Each structure stands twice: as structure tokens, then as C-alpha cells.
Amino acid sequence: MHPDLSPHLHTEECNLIISLLKKCHKEHNVLKFFGHCNDIDREMRKCLKKEFEENRRRNREKRQRIINAHKASEK
């Protein structure tokens, strides 16, 4: 199962791959069960993972800045 694939949650790159996957599923509604769209699906999952890791890194940096600012204000 994929996470929410709403366009406002993802980068343009991932949105393009998501739309290609949806198009593939629509055009090949039977072949999709036999792996016809698997390559696009793998690319989408790789893009979503990269996005997730980037968000995680950004949040970690933000948290560290907040902690450092809090420690500096205590001194």
C-alpha cells in the first residue's frame, strides 16, 4: 500500500511519476495484475523514499536548531 498520493504532498518529480503510474493502471487495467506497471511503481517508491528521507533530514536539522536556541537562551 502506498502513502497518500495527493499532489500537494509531493514534489513535481514524484507527481509526474505518480501520474504515469495512474495512467499505466488505467490503460492496462488487466495487465497491471501481471506486473506490467511494476517498473513505474518501483520508480515511484524510490522517489517517495527519497522525499521522505529529505523531509526527515530537514526536520532533524530544524529540531536541532530549536534545541540549540533553547540551550542558548538558558545561559
From Swiss-Prot:
Mitochondrion found in the keyword field: yes
Keywords in alphabetical order: Disulfide bond, Mitochondrion
Sequence motif: Cx9C motif 1, positions: 14-24
Short name of one Pfam family: Cmc1
InterPro entries in the cross-refs: Cyt_c_biogenesis_Cmc1-like
Source organism superkingdom: Eukaryota
Function: May be involved in cytochrome c oxidase biogenesis.
Name of the protein in question: COX assembly mitochondrial protein 2 homolog
Organism: Taeniopygia guttata
Lineage of the organism: Eukaryota, Metazoa, Chordata, Craniata, Vertebrata
